[in-house]
């Protein structure tokens, strides 16, 4: 699907490191008109409360403009953090890129 953008994130999604980058990228993507957004978390090895906050803010931003954010391949430690914060029922998580993209149909 040509109307889905996949954002590859890597490293640490923590306060002062990846959280601000994610915010900037999401603002740019939404300003460009993208509404179907997949955040690829495969290479994110650490996510703290700031990172979780930015993922949630990304989800809210997309929804505000009629879009959606879905998560792809979170590492086990990141998935555990999402589960502990009870965000997994709210956010759709996929292990397969094609499934994530097709879920927007």
Residue ranges and their predicted role:
Residues 103-105:
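A short, charged, amphipathic alpha-helix used as a generic interaction element across diverse proteins
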Residues 13-91:
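Amphipathic alpha-helical interaction surfaces in cytosolic regulatory modules
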Residues 76, 98-99:
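Acidic phosphotransfer microenvironment of two-component signaling modules
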Residues 92-96:
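Short acidic-hydrophobic, aromatic-tinged amphipathic segments that line or gate anion-handling sites
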Residues 1-8:
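Short beta-strand/loop segment at the start of cytosolic alpha/beta domains
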Residues 10, 97:
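Residues at the C-termini of beta-strands that transition into short coil/loop
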